[in-house]
Amino acid sequence: MSYNNTPEISVLLSTHNNENSINNSIKSIINQSFEDFELLIMNDASDDTTLKELKNFDDKRIKIFNNRSNLGLTKSLNLLLSKSSGKYIARQDADDISLKDRFTIQKKYIKKNNLKFCSARARSMHSNKKIPGVSFYIPEKVLFKYKNPHIHGTLFMEKKILEEVGGYDENFYFAQDFKLYCDLIKKNIKLARINKILYLMNTKDNISNKNKDEQRYYFECAKNNILPKVN
């Protein structure tokens, strides 16, 4: 199989000490039915065997980068964005799984509905429980009603709209995805959500579950358009 030098989709994945889950996460991407993509992976200073696991993959679409120190998700995603070449940006978390037709469905949905952004529904890989959320595009008044109506790992958008807002706001170590949604809404970008499960989430080890207080604080800062205080 030969691939274009300029892929249609750039997939951004940052990992820190995900040795037990990174293999399945990557496999779920390289086995997508839509094959014209690049998978950009940032090893964010892992001190377990994550890097070793990454090097086991022999796929020309995979590009591995390394941070010398742990920069966190927000800065790592911006670094990957700067190295991306696709028309579209897709997200993937290191401990989650994308279903086989995810990219095919999301790309078709965006083009059919003349959109620039969409997310998808997800299910917990541990309990078969659907992750709650809402459907179709989400106006500001609804966005602020929910804690976070879009699942970060399911994002699929035109690269140019992410660049237009300056990428992820690096003032937000947590809730960087919600801050992004706020920034996009200010640019009058419709935030659509496909009412279909395309993603499996690791709800046991999810960072949002481990850092609930920090997530809530940064969420409120984004919601109220104020900068978070950093200790």
Regions found by a protein language model. Name each.
Residues 89:
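Short aromatic/hydrophobic "clamp" motif used to bind/position activated sugar donors
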Residues 49-50, 77, 98-103, 128-129, ...:
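Acidic donor-diphosphate engagement hotspot in glycosyltransferases and nucleotidyltransferases
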Residues 82, 139-222:
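Conserved nucleotide-sugar donor-binding catalytic segment
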Residues 67-84, 105:
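Glycine-rich, basic loop-to-helix element that forms the pyrophosphate-binding segment
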Residues 27-36:
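Short, acidic, metal-binding catalytic loop of nucleotide-sugar glycosyltransferases
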Residues 43-52, 69, 93:
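A conserved acidic beta->alpha catalytic loop
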Residues 20-23, 48-56, 97, 101:
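Acidic helix N-cap motif at the loop->helix transition within catalytic regions
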Residues 101-132:
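Conserved donor NDP-sugar-binding/catalytic core segment of glycosyltransferases
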